[in-house]
Amino acid sequence: MTKSELVAQLASRFPQLVLKDADFAVKTMLDAMSDALAKGHRIEIRGFGSFGLNRRPARVGRNPKSGEKVQVPEKFVPHFKPGKELRERVDGRAGEPLKADDPDDER
């Protein structure tokens, strides 16, 4: 699902929202989440999951072209951990073949 598909689905579920307002709501939520992660905060959405940061320590890597050693600095990367309800809902679909996203699929 893309951001524009999420906006369209939000607007269709709440008819009082015009597409512009749904787009603003999604952008505002994503901006708030991005800002929180950039400040080092953890985001928890009960029943869905949590977003946090994982630390990748500094290490010595290799330049694939020249083979020379390169110092790779420490960095933090966003990480999502699904909640129990989401894991169980997804696990209920185990064994089903993967398919292209269908916006009409409400499962």
From Swiss-Prot:
Annotated segments matching region Disordered: 76-107
Swiss-Prot/TrEMBL GO biological process terms: DNA recombination; regulation of DNA-templated transcription; regulation of translation
Protein's job: This protein is one of the two subunits of integration host factor, a specific DNA-binding protein that functions in genetic recombination as well as in transcriptional and translational control.
HAMAP family: IHF_beta
UniProt keyword Transcription present: yes
PANTHER family: DNA-BINDING PROTEIN HU (PTHR33175), INTEGRATION HOST FACTOR SUBUNIT BETA (PTHR33175:SF5)
S-S bonds: none
Keywords, alphabetical: DNA recombination, DNA-binding, Transcription, Transcription regulation, Translation regulation
Organism: Burkholderia cenocepacia (strain ATCC BAA-245 / DSM 16553 / LMG 16656 / NCTC 13227 / J2315 / CF5610) (Burkholderia cepacia (strain J2315))
Highest taxon listed in the record's lineage: Bacteria
Cellular component GO terms held in the UniProt record: chromosome; cytosol
Family per similarity comment: Belongs to the bacterial histone-like protein family.
Oligomeric and partner information: Heterodimer of an alpha and a beta chain.
Biased composition (Basic and acidic residues): 82-101
Pfam families named in the record: Bac_DNA_binding (PF00216)
GO molecular function: DNA binding; structural constituent of chromatin
Full protein name: Integration host factor subunit beta
